[in-house]
């Protein structure tokens, strides 16, 4: 969608920003604008903010690891464009119409499935961060404690966390590895196919979503048990005057989140797009 706005004079100080809000007044995305005098044109790809996805290695040939790079597509409806130029704010309406190439598409049903997958990607992102944080903490405390029994308990906990972590996200770039469930790639793949297609998902896809949601819930339950094991070790850690375990909460995770990157420091969208076509 092209958004045009007029500036009487060139903006010499400060930034120009366009914010897209939905009908509930919620901010969907913020886009940097241009500062030229006269008519300015900014393109919005009609996508919202990407999900806060799980981290892991960038696996060659696997599109699911790019889930944190693509936001959900906005649905047809009325939106508000808020133009901010220095201390001045201007608002105008923006109407997104239905795609004439996809007549009869049930946008409401499609959006429900999209939001479900988005939520699954973010839930997994938080879970992976929590497991990784506690695993790393357990390893550090095991190296620092004097009590041999406590050290053994910490090492066992770290090993359990490591095993769970390996089922949640990719840890090895080699192909053909068997016996490992990697929810990050599997959930991410369904999310990306949903967001890069103009069609409703097939029954096999919705069945797969239900299965992966169940697997995610099982992983969350398993992690919850390990979190309790970690908490039970806190009194012993306190006796040794070491910092105790603290579970990473959602607010802290979201505040400190930065999008995962590949080895080059950025996503290779060209390869990702080839995999999705």
What are these regions (language model features)?
Residues 92-94, 125-277:
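Mature extracytoplasmic or organellar-lumen-exposed domains after removal of signal/transit peptides
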Residues 83-85:
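Conserved structural position at the C-terminal beta-strand
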Residues 5-7, 46, 96:
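Hydrophobic beta-strand positions in extracellular immunoglobulin-like domains
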Residues 27-72:
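Glycine-centered tight-turn motifs at strand-turn-strand junctions
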Residues 11, 20, 33-37, 72-76, ...:
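Active-site-proximal structural scaffolding
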Residues 91-126:
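Low-complexity, Pro/Ser/Thr- and charge-rich linker/hinge segments at domain boundaries
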Residues 1-17, 21, 41, 114-121, ...:
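Contiguous beta-strand segments within globular domains
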């Amino acid at each position: 969608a092209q958004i045009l706005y007029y500036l009487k004079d060139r903006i010499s100080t400060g930034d120009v920003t366009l914010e897209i809000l939905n009908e509930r007044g919620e901010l969907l995305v913020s886009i940097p604008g241009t500062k030229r005098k006269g008519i300015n044109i900014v393109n919005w790809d009609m996508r919202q903010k990407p999900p806060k996805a799980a981290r892991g290695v960038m696996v060659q040939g696997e599109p699911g690891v790019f889930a944190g790079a693509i936001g959900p597509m906005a649905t047809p409806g009325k939106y508000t464009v808020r133009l901010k130029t220095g201390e001045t704010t201007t608002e105008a309406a923006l109407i997104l119409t239905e795609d004439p190439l996809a007549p009869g598409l049930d946008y409401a049903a499609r959006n429900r499935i999209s939001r479900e997958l988005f939520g699954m990607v973010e839930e997994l992102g938080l879970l992976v961060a929590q497991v990784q944080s506690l695993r790393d903490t357990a390893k550090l405390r095991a190296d620092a404690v004097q009590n041999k029994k406590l050290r053994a308990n910490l090492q066992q906990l770290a090993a359990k966390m490591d095993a769970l972590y390996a089922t949640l996200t990719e840890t090895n770039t080699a192909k053909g590895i068997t016996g490992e469930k990697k929810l990050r790639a599997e959930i991410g793949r369904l999310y990306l196919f949903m967001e890069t297609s103009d069609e409703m998902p097939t029954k096999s896809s919705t069945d797969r979503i239900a299965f992966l949601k169940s697997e995610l819930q099982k992983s969350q339950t398993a992690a919850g048990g390990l979190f309790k094991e970690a908490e039970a070790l806190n009194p012993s850690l306190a006796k040794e005057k070491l910092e105790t375990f603290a579970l990473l909460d959602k607010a802290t995770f979201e505040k400190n989140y930065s999008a995962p990157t590949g080895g080059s420091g950025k996503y290779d969208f060209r390869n990702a797009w080839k995999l999705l076509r």
